[in-house]
Amino acid sequence: MKYTNIREGQFLSRPNRFIAKVEIDGKEEICHVKNTGRCRELLIPGVTVFLQEADFEHRKTKYDLIGVRKGNRLINMDSQVPNKVFREWLEKGYFQELQHIKQEQTFRNSRFDFYLEAGQRKIFVEVKGVTLEEEGVALFPDAPTERGVKHLRELSQAVAAGYEAYVVFIIQMKDIHYFTPNIKTHQAFGDSLIQAEKQGVKILALDCEVTEDSIEAGDFVTVKLVEG
């Protein structure tokens, strides 16, 4: 996926989860943050950030904050990107005989990100974007997510009903050793992920090639459900 009109700036502060103050070419600007998560380990005053200049004149903010440099690692933090990255990756042929892709498909009380048909296979997929990294380990979630727990339970129900089910973690950066659930932040999500795998839900993690103006799915990353 490619972006246009990218500008580099320095992060100053985040008054609330929707906006941030940044400096671009010596001028302070208010920008929209395309991730309502906490991102405290990323948005540190003075770090280099990447912003997309909006095409629409009537917006309240002129820029969208989409990426940040953390040490030598460039991290895309746009929460709208993972589904787009996954779809592009799908279309390169992971599922043989893929003939149908539908986004936002309802199953019982949940709406999953994707429903796929590949030959005789009927598949539900839930996609999660990952921006939290500690010492080369990718972690999800960065805040408690009861919605995430609900999705895992209902993916298990889909398996019991005869479907295939996947949860796919799109790690929005490169150079990751492995992925593991963030049990320090939300033990219930980690427990639910382990239980979902036991019940037949498949778990995939993919890292991404990230530049200032692009992001693309890269390689599979090892998933560790019990750290160590």
From Swiss-Prot:
| InterPro entries to which the protein is assigned, alphabetical | SfsA, SfsA_C, SfsA_N
Origin: domain of life: Bacteria
The entry lists its GO molecular-function terms as: DNA binding
Q: Which CDD domains match?
A: SfsA-like_bacterial (cd22359)
Query: One Pfam match, by short name?
Result: SfsA
NCBIfam families per record:
sfsA
The family database entries (HAMAP family) matched by this protein are listed as: SfsA
- What protein family is recorded? Belongs to the SfsA family.
Q: What is this protein called?
A: Sugar fermentation stimulation protein homolog
